[in-house]
Curated annotation (Swiss-Prot):
Cellular compartments per GO CC: host cell nucleus
Residues recorded as bearing Phosphoserine in the entry: 83, 91
GO molecular function, one term: ATP binding
Lineage: Viruses, Monodnaviria, Shotokuvirae, Cossaviricota, Papovaviricetes
Enzyme class (EC, first level): isomerase
Organism of derivation: Human papillomavirus type 5b
Protein name: Replication protein E1
Motif range (Nuclear export signal): 90-99
UniProt cross-references to InterPro entries, sorted A to Z: Helicase_SF3_DNA-vir, P-loop_NTPase, PPV_DNA_helicase_E1_C, PPV_DNA_helicase_E1_N, PPV_E1_DBD, PPV_E1_DBD_sf, Rep_E1_papillomaV, Znf_lg_T-Ag_D1_dom_sf
Amino acid sequence: MTDPNPKGSTSKEGFGDWCLLEADCSDVENDLGQLFERDTDSDISDLLDDTELEQGNSLELFHQQECEQSEEQLQKLKRKYLSPKAIAQLSPRLESISLSPQQKSKRRLFAEQDSGLELTLNNEAEDVTPEVEVPAIDSRPDDEGGSGDVDIHYTSLLRSSNKKATLMAKFKESFGVGFNELTRQFKSHKTCCKDWVVSVYAVHDDLFESSKQLLQQHCDYIWVRGIGAMSLYLLCFKAGKNRGTVHKLITSMLNVHEQQILSEPPKLRNTAAALFWYKGCMGSGAFSHGPYPDWIAQQTILGHKSAEASTFDFSAMVQWAFDNHLLDEPDIAYQYARLAPEDANAVAWLAHNNQAKFVRECAAMVRFYKKGQMRDMSISEWIYTKINEVEGEGHWSDIVKFIRYQNINFIVFLTALKEFLHSVPKKNCILIYGPPNSGKSSFAMSLIRVLKGRVLSFVNSKSQFWLQPLSECKIALLDDVTDPCWVYMDTYLRNGLDGHYVSLDCKYRAPTQMKFPPLLLTSNINVHGEANYRYLHSRIRGFEFPNPFPMKADNTPQFELTDQSWKSFFTRLWTQLDLSDQEEEGEDGESQRAFQCSARSANEHL
């Protein structure tokens, strides 16, 4: 306890009486019971809140903070990789181009309470300061090929989301015309075409100039021009190529990526497109090599063909089919369509609406002319005409050796063949019989083939018109005659085998009066040994082929029964067969000009 008398304290001097150096002790406070029973209220009560706590909205606050942080990181990445500088480097005008239509914004009546993402974007958009950048100047003049800064162009192309649209925009900006206006689209990469339009972006100057020389070995015609970073090629290849082959050639030659290439075939029937290529080669910046393609020349260059009328001349089509020996409608249609690039009349036929009608009528007229020509010829003139159509040379000895191989006297056979060709009554039918695989059909078919004869089939005997081919040939063949056929011939064809006139029923026509042409038969049955067909013995001359057809070690025929062999046979034995000399066929001074069925006058240009 402190002394109540302050005079006895000398430890701290200089403080005066205002400072209490020791606290006074009270005995009353030593009682713990009274201390706890006393009221504990003070002026700073309720400093700690002992009430029950609630969760509140801390989870939503945490979610909002996470979204703001993620959006901030995303915006930093966008500013880093999608800078407006990249769009300006690629194309100054591309920034204003939008592929999707702009939708009008709708005004909201009530603002919704969301996570604050939209507010964050709006605030960041307001804070962005617009940047103005001057486009880089290309080191290459506008009308020269190549590119001064390839890396910049290629990098800007890679940053584009739609590379094809970007290339087309650059092409139109450079050449002033759309790429699709000059080309037609091939969806498949495997479709072949000889002509291709190729546009390449960002090519080195040296490679661009060297391509003008390297492409000449692959193409008949080359058109090349470069403006800015775009290079345009019109390539007419010597052979058809697909898009993959063209890209492989261009990428290896120009050292570019396939994404830098646009390639489509050109429009062949568009006059405006043809004029673009024709006028483009007249400029100083264009390079061309070779003659103009036909589709450009026909639409741009005037000549004597342009003065001709574009009407279709049916007689010219008939004359063409007659000269080329085309009788079937499919052959006439296909071959005449292929003639269109060379013949103006074929082009007019393709443009006509009645192509099928003209083809049917043309085939009918050619058959009429051929049939009339055949009837007007003698057998000597017919054989002379047909063997002259055979190309190449053979040896007649193969046929003679084969006849002797079958144990037939050649003089007897030659006499029978002479009477057979001249249709001597009861001598105009020859039968070749023998066992199978003896060469009967091969020998007969080779003779019919070289003389352009017709083949009859007994399988059509139920039809009353099955003998109609006899009215359209100079020689006929009935192969592999069996017993039913012999019965039919013994019953109905005796007059025809005699060489007399018969009434032959032809389709769509009245029965025709005519004689049978020389008829060649093959069979496994010797009709002369059958008593049932005794009335045919005097009408048919038979020769037996008893020996099998010989073959070489390499499984080829030992005797070549070809068209060339028969050509040599008839030429060698022309006199022995009693065939007339062709120089003595007509009257003296008669012209030997070819048959003309067209309506062209003599004073027209050739």
